Amino acid sequence: MVVKIGILKCGNIGMSPVVDLCLDERADRNDIDVRVLGSGAKMGPEQVEEVAKKMVEEVKPDFIVYIGPNPAAPGPKKAREILSAGGIPTVIIGDAPGIKDKDAMAEEGLGYVLIKCDPMIGARRQFLDPVEMAMFNADVIRVLAGTGALRVVQNAIDDMVFAVEEGKEIPLPKIVITEQKAVDAMDFANPYAKAKAMAAFVMAEKVADIDVKGCFMTKEMEKYIPIVASAHEAIRYAAKLVDEARELEKATDAVSRKPHAGEGKILNKCKLMAKPE
């Protein structure tokens, strides 16, 4: 059986570029077929409505993954309205601002995975250009991967896939990813590696607070430019911490790897030269 997954990308968070790729990391999985629709960097109600309706009415997947910033914003709320009424099981993946709407999403019949370490970018024209944007997102992706947050997202979607394959009701996740949930998913062998990953997660959370201050709460240019710059410096060091954590695991040949088998099963290994089982 091939499970058809529909992914809606509206706007961008750190998890957006890899949410589909983490389900099929070698492009050799034969039990899923993924279709991705998106509205680019924008997530206004008009853009979101167009792609959400197309996903529900034309693509008609077995389930839908919607991903983007702040699920409580007007555009994502419009998507939630369409997806809730569409009759297709749907999970909303978002960042920390969505936590305040998690009960509303549950009432709408939607699942959610809200990632506290996926921070807002320093979106000030005087600071953010395409290069800075790309480097920030690269650092965030390293934090998501190295702390275990990415693995929590991947496992939640895989559980939905497996339910379809087994003919069971699709479980709609209701997850807020904290530092503890993230590092638990990584199966760290070295407690210092785990501690470094937890520190990186908390630093990334703080980056969001700093960027909110710089983007929305500070009006003077000479004040908000160094504020958002400091947030980007912080995420760079959070990414370094997860690199340090992984190097500690490498030193004792204890890196947790969980690749997908061709038929979709999640395999497991720790020793570099061992076969995944």
UniProtKB/Swiss-Prot annotation:
Q: Record's InterPro entries? A: MTD, MTD_sf
Q: What's its catalytic activity?
A: 5,10-methylenetetrahydromethanopterin + oxidized coenzyme F420-(gamma-L-Glu)(n) + 2 H(+) = 5,10-methenyl-5,6,7,8-tetrahydromethanopterin + reduced coenzyme F420-(gamma-L-Glu)(n)
- Matching SUPFAM superfamilies, A to Z? F420-dependent methylenetetrahydromethanopterin dehydrogenase (MTD)
An example of a Gene Ontology BP annotation on this entry?
one-carbon metabolic process
Q: What class of enzyme is it?
A: oxidoreductase
Q: Which UniProt keywords apply?
A: Methanogenesis, One-carbon metabolism, Oxidoreductase
- Pathway(s) annotated for this protein in UniProt: One-carbon metabolism; methanogenesis from CO(2); 5,10-methylene-5,6,7,8-tetrahydromethanopterin from 5,10-methenyl-5,6,7,8-tetrahydromethanopterin (coenzyme F420 route): step 1/1
- One GO MF term: ferredoxin hydrogenase activity
Q: What is its EC number?
A: 1.5.98.1
Is Endoplasmic reticulum tagged as a keyword? no
Tell me, what does this protein do in biology? Catalyzes the reversible reduction of methenyl-H(4)MPT(+) to methylene-H(4)MPT.
Q: Which family is this sequence assigned to?
A: Belongs to the MTD family.
NCBIfam families, alphabetized: PRK00994.1
Name under which the protein is recorded: F420-dependent methylenetetrahydromethanopterin dehydrogenase
The organism of origin for this protein: Methanococcus maripaludis (strain C7 / ATCC BAA-1331)
Q: Which gene encodes it?
A: mtd
